[in-house]
């Protein structure tokens, strides 16, 4: 999506702040969900899209027009379109993927545009690694 949209809208800067993480669920379902958010971001952005990814959340924001506060969460229902939207299915698909994998999605206005956040209420438990090595003088931890 980013590469295709960059050809169509080269004036949009894509800013990334991404950690290597693993979200629960099927990779294809997440690809479709993220593509839907990114397509919307490219449709409405004025000059930039920012993608941030951490262990338990993902945020895609842009500097496009703000959404009416009373309509933001309704955009996750099927056939609900924002101004300039196409079919009203993209964010509904995002919502279904999130729910199926125990994540939450929300949209909100930001200081300079709109952002969509996917997150978990409960953080994933990380397993402790055994036999880790400290790179301090080659000593074993």
Region locations from a protein language model:
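Conserved micro-motifs of the catalytic ATP-binding
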Residues: 18, 22-28
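Short helix-loop "hinge" at the ATP-lid/N-box region of the Bergerat-fold HATPase_c
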Residues: 40-42
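Short alpha-helical Gxxx[C/S/T] motif in the catalytic ATP-binding
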Residues: 90, 94
């Amino acid at each position: 999506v980013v590469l295709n949209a960059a050809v169509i809208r080269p004036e949009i800067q894509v800013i990334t702040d991404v950690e290597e993480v693993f979200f629960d669920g099927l990779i294809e379902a997440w690809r479709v969900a993220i593509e839907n958010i990114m397509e919307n971001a490219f449709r409405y952005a004025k000059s930039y899209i920012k993608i941030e990814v951490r262990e338990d959340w993902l945020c895609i924001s842009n500097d496009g027009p703000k959404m009416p506060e009373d309509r933001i969460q309704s955009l996750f229902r099927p056939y609900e379109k924002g101004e300039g939207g196409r079919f009203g299915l993209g964010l509904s698909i995002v919502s279904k993927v999130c729910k199926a994998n125990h994540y939450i999605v929300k949209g909100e206005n930001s200081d300079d545009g709109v952002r969509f956040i996917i997150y978990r209420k409960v953080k994933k438990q990380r397993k402790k690694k055994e036999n880790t090595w400290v790179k301090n003088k080659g000593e074993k931890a």
